[in-house]
Amino acid sequence: TERYNASYIMTDLNIGPKLNLVTGVRLEVNKTKYTSYHGMQTTLPHFNSMGSDTVFSYERDNRYSLPSLFVKYDVTDWLSLRFAGTKTLTRPDYADIIPLYNISGGSGTVTYRNPFLEPGVSQNRDYVTTFYDNRLGLLSFSYFTKEIKDLIYSSGRRYITDPSLYGLPWYTEKNMIIDYKTNNPYKVLLSGFEIDYQTRFWYLPNLLRGLVFNANYTRTESEVKYPRTVIEQEIIFDPSFQVITSNVDSFYVDRLLDQPKDIINLSLGYDYKGFSGRLSMMYISCLLYTSDAADDRDS
């Protein structure tokens, strides 16, 4: 089950003929009770130990206040300055937070979902300068920043030294979680700029006056500290032979997952009476799809 409640208060103020302020706050409460299975597989795939396939429920209660501020100042009839400050959430997927685990007794691995994941919280700032002219059209220059806390990502394999940290039974100690998703303890920093141009060639003769052109370019820079776990084994011979396995935690710096550095949008269109058509093109530079830890190259 899931209960989602939200309320907000907002005000829209005009201060003189040139300045407009829109501000408010949104309060959100998200309560969930998800049910899933706890299972154990033995070395014989057709046999599970008694009581191993049990149904378990976990309740979550997330509460957030999300303020926002939007400012617009018309310097002249052709120049406008804007600012936006917002706080937003990225909620974890349902499949990532159900209270599910499945223990493979033969391989010593655990398929695990993390019900303790928290939503990612982003503080956003946007600064926009807009120029407008009847012939030029609309030209905008934007600069934006994001500061993301508790980014959700896959940290790869995890050696279990203390099962209670994951809500697992005691006998999973020294087993291995196959793919451990967690909240990044380091803040993510993202910034960039955007240039947007929109125009209509109404002043051209005859049929050419129906032409429409749009162009947009976005450049983004990001820096993320990705925690990485290297599983190391130490062999000790004296006074007795033993193998000690441990998690060695570190981090590496890279850009944000699924965030391209460059995005270009071009659109050429034509409007005539009831007809409207567009020919569009989008270019997206290379993406970072998975973290090094998720690839498990260093584990």
Model-based region annotation:
Residues T1-T76, N102-I103:
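Signature of Gram-negative outer-membrane beta-barrel scaffolds
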Residues E2-R3, R60-D61, L89-I148, Y166-F201, ...:
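Outer-membrane beta-barrel signature, preferentially recognizing the C-terminal barrel domain
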Residues S7-L13, L19-L27, P67-V75, L79-K87, ...:
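Membrane-embedded beta-strands that build the outer-membrane beta-barrel scaffold
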Residues V29-Y37, L89-A95, L100, R135, ...:
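Gram-negative outer-membrane beta-barrel proteins
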Residues K33-Y58, I97-R113, R157-D179, P227-Y252, ...:
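Solvent-exposed loop segments that connect transmembrane elements
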Residues P67, P92, P260, A293-A294:
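Proline-centered helix-kink/hinge sites
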Residues T145-E147, L165-C286:
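Gram-negative outer-membrane beta-barrel transporters
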Residues Y289-S299:
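Single conserved hydrophobic/aromatic residue that forms the stacking wall/gate
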